[in-house]
Amino acid sequence: MVLSSDIDLLNPPAELEKTKHKRKRLVQSPNSFFMDVKCQGCFNITTVFSHSQTVVMCGSCSSVLCTPTGWPRRLTEGCSFRRKSD
């Protein structure tokens, strides 16, 4: 007998999988990712790791792009980012 409130364990919903710990998911995957950060002054794009532990500076104008505060990184006001595709 199948109830409507049952969850299919082989095909769980994506929302449910995102809330689980990275090792408890059906297919293990990391929470970290690389992202492209655009500088607010010179519009130069820099690739940054989401969990990096150092301050990231712009290569051309030396302004601070991100500061380490845990996850997610704190971007400087005015900077924009996008997640890099696999």
UniProtKB/Swiss-Prot annotation:
GO CC term, one of those recorded: ribonucleoprotein complex
Zn finger residue spans: C4-type: 39-61
Gene3D superfamilies for the chain: Zn-binding ribosomal proteins
Note on how the cofactor is bound: Binds 1 zinc ion per subunit.
Disulfide-bonded cysteines: none
PROSITE patterns: RIBOSOMAL_S27E
Family to which this protein belongs: Belongs to the eukaryotic ribosomal protein eS27 family.
Protein's UniProt name: Small ribosomal subunit protein eS27
